[in-house]
Amino acid sequence: MLAELSIKNFAIIEELTVSFERGLTVLTGETGAGKSIIIDAISLLVGGRGSSEFVRYGEAKAELEGLFLLESGHPVLGVCAEQGIDVSDEMIVMRRDISTSGKSVCRVNGKLVTIASLREIGRLLLDIHGQHDNQLLMEDENHLQLLDKFAGAEVESALKTYQEGYQRYVKLLKKLKQLSESEQEMAHRLDLIQFQLEEIESAKLELNEDEQLQEERQQISNFEKIYESLQNAYNALRSEQGGLDWVGMASAQLEDISDINEPLKKMSESVSNSYYLLEDATFQMRNMLDELEFDPERLNYIETRLNEIKQLKRKYGATVEDILEYASKIEEEIDQIENRDSHLQSLKKELDSVGKDVAVEAANVSQIRKTWAKKLADEIHRELKSLYMEKSTFDTEFKVRTASRNEEAPLVNGQPVQLTEQGIDLVKFLISTNTGEPLKSLSKVASGGELSRVMLAIKSIFSSQQDVTSIIFDEVDTGVSGRVAQAIAEKIHKVSIGSQVLCITHLPQVAAMADTHLYIAKELKDGRTTTRVKPLSKQEKVAEIGRMIAGVEVTDLTKRHAKELLKQADQVKTTG
């Protein structure tokens, strides 16, 4: 949810910070006070089109900042992770500065991002619906996802089964495409990898060979130093009156007194052990001295061999193991190319089999969607009826993603289909608002009043299905009154149960339904107009709703009417 909004030097707003709560927040006030400016600021904050005209006159830039609180597992967390944006304590701070040149600087949790990134994140946080806005529900490409969310676990399970087969199908299709490349490309490829395999095999590499050779080279290169040091060490220990003799004498002396007490016994054992360790070391030194031999030809061979391995590493892998793995891989590829026809037939047969299985799963997903689409239509008809649009008809149009006849494509009901991650369906919500009128897409609903009610009916069902945390209605109640106005108010309240809702309204019925009522007013400050926001108390709500009813003068009658609306709203909230 949008927890706090800060605006500075934006249009007529000098500086303003507004806190928002859960549930339904309404913004009311006189025309021109700045209600829509606040919504404009929110729209720009989440990636809307900016302009230098938004910068307050005489200032260098406009500054917008919003704090969003998230629930764990919200999809926006994944998007932020992909973009390297750190999100701690499940909070996102979005900021956008707009200069007088029209350029924007955008940040999310302090990280600079592009407008496109800001918009991508914003779409998952806010859904703004105004009289002319295109928003999530009006965009056809979102309808499949919304239908799947409405269908829930049943379609989710079927889709998961389908996607497992689909991934296997895609891999096979890729292998088939690689094998089906032109003869000339295949011939060139075969020549190349045969040469590479011959080069690797002729080297007769062994695992860890390079490490062993480097160790041996180190030893031969330091022959003189190793021999001299070993000889000196051996002489120091083994010559007449050498170190080993002195340690032996010390051990014998301590042995004579070792049974007097425990400390002497331990001391004797320690020196005795040291003697045997040193004696063993001298044997090893002698053996190594006898084996040491300087062989310049061996050193030359090692250098040549290491250089050969180095050249192979540069071409085929960082280690000998990598080179051998690459050799195994291209050996398999050579076999596939040389036996291409056989592999092609085998692969086509497997692809055809998998494709048939996947097509069955795709058809199953499609059928489940169609079943739930009917349930969705029934629910939306009920919602529209409660908004006094009982003559409206809602339906979901299904089209199959078709493939051309010359493609290697699986068949569903005898028709070649194009498989995608989400199945074979193209889904679009359609509506007719009057008897006898044809069904058309949501974006083609002409009447502002009708569009408002249609969107509210759909949103009352989908508000809990959408990923957005906040929904904004900007004067969606235009062109309605009376019982329709009351129905709209109740529907907006219903939407606010599942999502935070901010609503600019001119309808007293909607204002009465608010959990939080913010009054937007203009005031003069240092000879300039600015905007202020005031949360209304219960008594102030009565006065403001009375003003909305009366238009100008608030009378005792309009106050009574306002109290009646508030009482009615409380009853609606209580009964649900």
Swiss-Prot record:
Alphabetical list of Pfam families matching this protein: AAA_23 (PF13476)
A cellular-component GO term for this protein: cytoplasm
UniProt KW keywords: ATP-binding, Cytoplasm, DNA damage, DNA repair, Nucleotide-binding
Subcellular location field: Cytoplasm, Nucleoid
Principal location class: cytoplasm
Gene Ontology biological process terms from the UniProt entry: DNA recombination; double-strand break repair; SOS response
One Gene Ontology term of the molecular function aspect: ATP hydrolysis activity
Residues binding ATP, per UniProt: G29, E30, T31, G32, A33, G34, K35, S36
InterPro entries reported in the protein's UniProt record: DNA_recomb/repair_RecN, P-loop_NTPase, Rad50/SbcC_AAA
This protein's record includes keyword DNA damage: yes
Cytoplasm recorded as keyword: yes
UniProt cross-references to PANTHER family, sorted A to Z: DNA REPAIR PROTEIN RECN
Subunit comment: Forms multimers, possibly octamers; these become larger following DNA damage. Recruited to foci following DNA damage; probably interacts with RecF and RecO.
Family of the protein in this entry: Belongs to the RecN family.
Chain's role: Involved in recombinational repair of damaged DNA. Seems to be the first protein recruited to repair centers, foci that are the site of double-strand DNA break(s), followed by RecO and then RecF.
Name listed for the protein in its UniProt record: DNA repair protein RecN
Organism: Bacillus subtilis (strain 168)
Gene for this chain: recN
